[in-house]
C-alpha cells in the first residue's frame, strides 16, 4: 500500500531535490536565483505532506470503542469536513468539504476519526469519484454500520486554471451504502442534512 515519493536517497531511481531543480530549469528558470534556491527542498517537503495518506492505514484510524454511546442507533452526520487533495491527471489541487453520515449497528467511532479518514484518502493522488467511494466503502467495511452516506463538494483547479476555465464551478459526488440505498426516508434525511449551509 505504501508508495512514498522519497525513500532512500542512495537509490538512483529515487526522486530527489535535484529532480525538482531540473524541473525549474526545464521551465526556463534559474534554479540558483535567490527566490528559487530553497524551492526544491520546500517542494519536496510539501509533496511528502500532500501524499502522506499512503503511509496511513484506514483500519487503524477507524478503531471502534465502547462507552455506552454504541447503544445509539440513529443517524450520525458530520459535515463541513475539509478536503484538500490533488488530481491524479494534472497534479492540480482540488478542495472543498465532505459530509459523512452513518447509522450505527452496535459500533461507533470518535467523530474526529471521520475527519482523519477523509484526510487519509485525500492525501493521495485522487479523482473525486474514487475518493468518495473509498471513504464510504472503508467506513462500511471496518465499522459495519447499517448505512453509510458520503457527499463531497469540491472545486478543481485543473478546470478553473486551465482547459475550460470555469472559476467557482463545484463538483458534487455521493456514495450511499446499506440501508441508505433502500430506505427512502433515511436517504432523504441524510441528503437534507448534507445540504450546504445557507
From Swiss-Prot:
Catalytic reaction annotation: GTP + H2O = 7,8-dihydroneopterin 3'-triphosphate + formate + H(+)
Lineage: Bacteria, Pseudomonadati, Pseudomonadota, Betaproteobacteria, Burkholderiales
Source organism (scientific name): Janthinobacterium sp. (strain Marseille)
Annotated EC: 3.5.4.16
Gene: folE
Record GO biological process: one-carbon metabolic process; tetrahydrobiopterin biosynthetic process; tetrahydrofolate biosynthetic process
Protein's name in the database: GTP cyclohydrolase 1
NCBIfam families from the UniProt entry: folE, PRK09347.1-2, PRK09347.1-3
GO CC aspect terms: cytoplasm
Source taxon at top rank: Bacteria
Family membership noted in the UniProt record: Belongs to the GTP cyclohydrolase I family.
UniProt pathway annotation: Cofactor biosynthesis; 7,8-dihydroneopterin triphosphate biosynthesis; 7,8-dihydroneopterin triphosphate from GTP: step 1/1
